[in-house]
Amino acid sequence: LIHHIALAFAAALLTHDALSAQPAKQSPYPHATETIGSVRQIYDGVLTPEMAISTFRNIDRLFPVRSVPRSSNPMPLPRAAVPLRTIRFSDGGKLYDLDSYLELNRVSGLLILKDGRIKLERYRYGNTGLTRWMSMSIAKSLTSTLIGAAVKQGKIKSLADPVTHYVPALSGSAYEGVSIRDVLMMASGVRWNETYTDAASDRRRLLEAQISQKPGSALKVMGSLPRAAAPGTVNNYNTGETQVAAEILRNATGKSLATYLHEQIWSRVGMEADANWWLESPDGIEIGGSGFSATLRDYGRFGLFLLNGGRVNGESILPERWLQEATTPKVLRDGKAQDYGYLWWTGTTPVSRRDGAYSAEGIHGQFLYVNPAARVVIVVWGAQPEPLGGAVINDWAFFEAVAGALR
C-alpha cells in the first residue's frame, strides 16, 4: 500500500511538473486591510482574541519579508471519498470531540490528510483557503529541512563541521567549538533565556534586534552571548540557534533561505500560493526560527513531502535517512537522551514512538504533525492570544486519536 501511495504521489508531482503553464494570478489577499497589533504585543501575549486573529494572518505587515513564489503547477490535494466528520477522544480523564477541540484550543484552521487526500479541512474566525497564517517556530523545522538539502547537495560537508567554518563572524564567541549538529539539537551550550514575556530575556533581545532592522544585528546578539555549558551536553530551547542555522545556510548555499526553499521544495512539490518570510533587515537574512507564513494547504503539502521521505518525482531532496535522523530523539555528547531531534519535536508516548510521529510546533498553538506509520499529516493553526499555556486540550492527544481512527 505504501508503495502504491508513493507512486501516486510521485505521479501527481510528475504530471504538474511536466506542464509549462505560468502561475495563475492570485486573488487579492482578503485580510489586507484589517487592523493589526504589534510584534511586541504578540510576544507579550496581550492581544485581544480578535486582534490576535487579524495579526496572526497579517504578520507580513510587521516586518519586511521575502516571498517564496508558488509553483506554476500546484499539486492536487483530492478529497477523500469518506471524510472525517468527528473524532472522540480523552485527555486528562475528560472526553472531548472535534468541535470541543476546535473551540477550547481556539483553532483557526485545521487540515487532516490521509494518504495524500483531504479527510477534513476547516477554517474558522473568517479564515479561508487564501489566508496565510503565521508559522512561529514551525519555521525552525523548515530551516532544519533546508540544512538537510544543503547536506545532500554537498554545500554543507558534515553536521560535525564547526559553526565557525560557515559563520566566521562567530569566531572567538561562545560558538567556538560548536558543531552544526549541536545547533540543530539546541545543545550549543551557549547561555539562553527563551522567556517570551520577559522583556529582558535573550529571546526578546533577539526580537529587538529584528525590530531595529539593522543588518547584522541578530548575529551580533548571538555573538555576544556567554557560554553556560560544554557544547553538545545540555539541551536548552533557543530560538537564537536557528538564526545561527540561517547564517550557516546562507553562507553555505550563497542564497537566501526563501530562494533556497523555493528552489528545493516550494516550486518542486507544487505549492499553490506564495509564502512570506520575515527578514532581519530590508533585503537582509530571513529569521530562521519564526516569521514564515503560508496557506493551510501548503503547510499540508510540506507535510506530504516529508511523509514521502523528502522525495519529489523520485528524486531525493534530502540525504538518505535524513528524516529518520532529524525526527527521532537524539543523544547528547555525554550520552543523555532528549525528546528532540534536529529542530523537530519527537513523540513521547509509546504510541507516538511506535509510529515514528513527530511535529513542528509554534507558540500560540501552531502545529504540523506527521505520522509516517498511519500516513497522516495534520496542520493546526492556533489563535491563542498567550504565547504558551493557552491550550485546554493536549494537542498530541487529539493527533494520536485522529491517527488511530484513520489507520
Question: What feature does the model see in each segment?
Answer:
Residues 271-276, 324-377:
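Active-site Gly/Thr loop motif
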Residues 4-16:
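Bacterial N-terminal signal peptides
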Residues 87-88, 93-101, 117, 128-130, ...:
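Active-site-proximal loop and beta-strand segments within enzyme catalytic domains
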